[in-house]
């Protein structure tokens, strides 16, 4: 029940980047420690920090041992920004709950595998339909190549 509460918050945060992140997706992240939100963020603008980094910056040391709720699978490749997976691992987060896998072939399951390989518990699919509706264009573009 609480998982849905935190993911709902992450989805609401993701909507804040609706007109500023293209061609990247809208992503929200909430970090929870002892049933309290200690960090939250969203991808604010293309080329700038992703949601996970903004949430980790807010959480600071409180991220250690926490759970992250993320609307889209974290990246584990270098693009305009460094991999979010590395930052998650370095922060000491123990659990990651992801709403949707990233359909981008550069990511698509690789972020999940990487986090699991590093000992982080990962769950996928919480409120996936709800989060994907705010990224319809991104999902369509990644799956079909069409705008």
From Swiss-Prot:
<feature type="domain" description="CMP/dCMP-type deaminase">
    <location>
        <begin position="1"/>
        <end position="122"/>
    </location>
</feature>
<keyword id="KW-0686">Riboflavin biosynthesis</keyword>
<dbReference type="GO" id="GO:0008270">
    <property type="term" value="F:zinc ion binding"/>
</dbReference>
<keyword id="KW-0378">Hydrolase</keyword>
<dbReference type="GO" id="GO:0008835">
    <property type="term" value="F:diaminohydroxyphosphoribosylaminopyrimidine deaminase activity"/>
</dbReference>
<dbReference type="InterPro" id="IPR016192">
    <property type="entry name" value="APOBEC/CMP_deaminase_Zn-bd"/>
</dbReference>
<feature type="binding site">
    <location>
        <position position="84"/>
    </location>
    <ligand>
        <name>Zn(2+)</name>
    </ligand>
</feature>
<comment type="pathway">
    <text>Cofactor biosynthesis; riboflavin biosynthesis; 5-amino-6-(D-ribitylamino)uracil from GTP: step 2/4.</text>
</comment>
<feature type="active site" description="Proton donor">
    <location>
        <position position="52"/>
    </location>
</feature>
<protein>
    <recommendedName>
        <fullName>Diaminohydroxyphosphoribosylamino-pyrimidine deaminase</fullName>
        <ecNumber>3.5.4.26</ecNumber>
    </recommendedName>
</protein>
<keyword id="KW-0862">Zinc</keyword>
<dbReference type="InterPro" id="IPR016193">
    <property type="entry name" value="Cytidine_deaminase-like"/>
</dbReference>
<comment type="similarity">
    <text>Belongs to the cytidine and deoxycytidylate deaminase family.</text>
</comment>
<dbReference type="InterPro" id="IPR004794">
    <property type="entry name" value="Eubact_RibD"/>
</dbReference>
<keyword id="KW-0479">Metal-binding</keyword>
<feature type="binding site">
    <location>
        <position position="75"/>
    </location>
    <ligand>
        <name>Zn(2+)</name>
    </ligand>
</feature>
<dbReference type="InterPro" id="IPR002125">
    <property type="entry name" value="CMP_dCMP_dom"/>
</dbReference>
<dbReference type="GO" id="GO:0009231">
    <property type="term" value="P:riboflavin biosynthetic process"/>
</dbReference>
<feature type="binding site">
    <location>
        <position position="50"/>
    </location>
    <ligand>
        <name>Zn(2+)</name>
    </ligand>
</feature>
<dbReference type="Pfam" id="PF00383">
    <property type="entry name" value="dCMP_cyt_deam_1"/>
</dbReference>
